[in-house]
């Protein structure tokens, strides 16, 4: 029978296993007692930490709960539109009071005494098939029933649509390690800035500034201190001397200039007042006689 004639599902839940998450939808309206039993045992933690341990390759993957509690046997619920006609369907084993998931496409001929009440939806079918591919133990209780060496474990459940009024929707209870992963990362505290502060700078009032330790100074002997002090006194005295020397030098230079100017003036006056000597007079006389001789004569012939 094709799945397009199946009735609409009315309840939903998510199984969180160690191999991945499996989304399940239930026909709570068509199989009310079976679906209510399944959701009740999920919500009260009966199935928590149970294992998908046993596999019958021709029929089902059985869920093995640690305890089924004191629940009475579920009544038989049949619907002509819902049948075991493919893999990934949920069935209830009324004799063992637990549930399973079908493996083969058509196993209705061996599951007539079980109630079909739900199905795996979406991409969860690939998680289910991955569970089926787990490693099988070498020895088994029965030749037909195999046991997984590392079975998938049901760690938590989430009922998203309970359908029944006395069953409330539940959110997933996170494990401790998952809570740590989902905790928001703490903001990194910025480290205080380090600023170099020198002795000749004013202190900074910024609270984030950390001052460096003052540098160590060398302690000089007493005799070096005395010499440095005396040299400092001499240096201070010598700082005033250049100004006095400059003033004195300017005054002396001015006096020397005035004295030189006076001497030059006096020498010029003495030159004007001195009479011509004998040789100069003789030279002038000879020049006068020469001029008289050549007067009116053409000496260029």
Curated annotation (Swiss-Prot):
Residues 9-159 form the PPIase cyclophilin-type domain. It comes from the Eukaryota. The keyword Isomerase applies. GO terms for molecular function: peptidyl-prolyl cis-trans isomerase activity. Keywords: Cytoplasm, Isomerase, mRNA processing, mRNA splicing, Nucleus, Rotamase, Spliceosome. It catalyses: [protein]-peptidylproline (omega=180) = [protein]-peptidylproline (omega=0). Its EC number is 5.2.1.8. The keyword Transmembrane does not apply. Belongs to the CWC complex (or CEF1-associated complex), a spliceosome subcomplex composed of the U2, U5 and U6 snRNAs and at least BUD13, BUD31, BRR2, CDC40, CEF1, CLF1, CUS1, CWC2, CWC15, CWC21, CWC22, CWC23, CWC24, CWC25, CWC27, ECM2, HSH155, IST3, ISY1, LEA1, MSL1, NTC20, PRP8, PRP9, PRP11, PRP19, PRP21, PRP22, PRP45, PRP46, SLU7, SMB1, SMD1, SMD2, SMD3, SMX2, SMX3, SNT309, SNU114, SPP2, SYF1, SYF2, RSE1 and YJU2. Present with 2360 molecules/cell in log phase SD medium. This is Peptidyl-prolyl isomerase CWC27. It comes from Saccharomyces cerevisiae (strain ATCC 204508 / S288c) (Baker's yeast).
């Amino acid at each position: 029978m094709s799945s397009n004639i199946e009735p609409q599902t009315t309840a939903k839940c998510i199984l969180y296993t160690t191999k991945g998450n499996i989304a399940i939808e239930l026909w709570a309206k068509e199989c009310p007692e079976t679906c209510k039993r399944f959701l009740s045992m999920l919500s009260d933690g009966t199935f928590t930490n149970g294992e998908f341990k046993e596999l019958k390759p021709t029929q089902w993957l059985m869920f093995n709960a640690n305890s089924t509690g004191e629940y009475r046997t579920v009544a038989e619920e049949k619907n002509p539109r819902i049948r075991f006609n493919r893999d990934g369907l949920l069935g209830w084993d009324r004799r063992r009071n637990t549930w399973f998931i079908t493996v083969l496409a058509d196993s209705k001929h061996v599951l007539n005494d079980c109630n079909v009440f739900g199905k795996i939806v979406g991409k969860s079918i690939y998680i289910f098939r991955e569970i089926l591919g787990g490693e099988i133990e070498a020895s088994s209780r029965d030749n037909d029933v195999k046991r997984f060496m590392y079975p998938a474990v049901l760690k938590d459940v989430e009922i998203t649509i309970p359908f029944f009024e006395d069953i409330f929707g539940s959110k997933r209870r996170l494990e401790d390690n998952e809570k740590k992963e989902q905790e928001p990362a703490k903001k990194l505290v910025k480290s205080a800035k380090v600023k170099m502060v020198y002795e000749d700078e004013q202190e900074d009032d910024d609270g984030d500034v950390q001052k460096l330790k003052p540098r160590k100074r060398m302690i000089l002997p007493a005799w070096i201190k005395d010499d440095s002090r005396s040299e400092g006194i001499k240096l201070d005295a010598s700082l005033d001397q250049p100004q006095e020397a400059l003033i004195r030098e300017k005054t002396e230079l001015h006096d020397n200039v005035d004295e030189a100017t006076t001497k030059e003036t006096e020498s010029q006056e003495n030159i004007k007042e001195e009479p011509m000597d004998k040789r100069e007079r003789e030279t002038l006389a000879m020049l006068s006689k020469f001029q008289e001789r050549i007067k009116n004569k053409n000496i260029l012939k």
